[in-house]
Design a protein with these regions (language model features):
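Secretory-pathway/membrane protein signature
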Residues: 1-136
Length: 136
């Protein structure tokens, strides 16, 4: 929990209260854990191919959703994720090669879809949110 007497404050004293980010108020064990998590995340992302630049959905007036995405340089395969519009977590759907798939029985109005790129080393990019197809 943030302590706003110490975080995001200029160093000063007002009404007997010391404000500001100072070394004596640091939690170095916590800082080390956060730093390690950041390093591990950056390493995993650096080993992965870039995420697809864009992804689109089709499926109006049908019970299937067509997903298309741009190829990513260095991608060996792609992972498709979906989640209901009222859910917060992605669910893995399938892994495939190519840049298009049809998700049978997945209604586009009720779900969000995303695509990530997978390297030969197994490293995975961030997920690209698939929106509606561009207007023409």
């Amino acid at each position: 929990v943030e302590n706003y007497h110490h975080q995001h404050q200029n160093v000063r004293t007002e009404n007997g209260i010391e404000y500001g980010d100072t070394v004596d108020k640091m939690d170095f064990d916590y800082l080390a854990k956060v730093t390690m998590l950041n390093v591990l995340t950056a390493t995993a992302l650096a080993d992965a191919p870039p995420a697809p630049a864009s992804a689109t959905l089709g499926g109006a007036v049908t019970s299937n959703t067509t997903v298309r995405w741009d190829a990513s340089l260095g991608a060996h395969a792609y992972r498709i994720y979906q989640r209901r519009a009222d859910a917060q977590d992605w669910s893995f759907v399938r892994e495939l090669q190519g840049t298009e798939t049809v998700l049978e029985g997945l209604i586009v109005d009720d779900h969000f879809v995303g695509v990530s790129a997978l390297g030969k080393n197994g490293a995975e990019s961030t997920i690209t949110f698939a929106g509606l197809p561009p207007r023409r």
